[in-house]
Amino acid sequence: MVINENLNLMDKLKILTDAAKYDVACTSSGVERRGDGTGMGNSIAAGICHSFSGDGRCISLLKILYTNECVFDCHYCINRRSNDVERASFTPEEICQLTMEFYRRNYIEGLFLSSGVKHSPDETMEELCRTAELLRNQYHFQGYIHMLSLIHI
């Protein structure tokens, strides 16, 4: 597994939103609004998906992975250890900053956060919880958060 430590935030965003599209727990409506490259508004490249709230509203979510690194080699998973893909990881702070910037621009109403298992399920889960805690308590984010719970059987 090759890990590039010199990625900037946009590189990480591209890699980790692209890898998140394989998590079918939140699939988009199928609408593809591509930008022409001259301005803002290309939600396809930004990892925006759509889901429905309890009251039936369609809401936009930033769908990203915390990391696509994984210690496991599950054959069904795109992030499996033996798969030759570019690896990247966010920090909790980076995810919070991205979420808030997307929210302030009214691109999203919430965050869909999933992850590979970086070192251990417990350690990765602690980082995911730290991210949610920062969003709620430091950034005062009141939007929707859907977060994967990692277990190892």
Q: Where are the regions that the model predicts?
A:
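Short, charged beta->alpha transition segments
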Residues: K63-I64, E93-R104
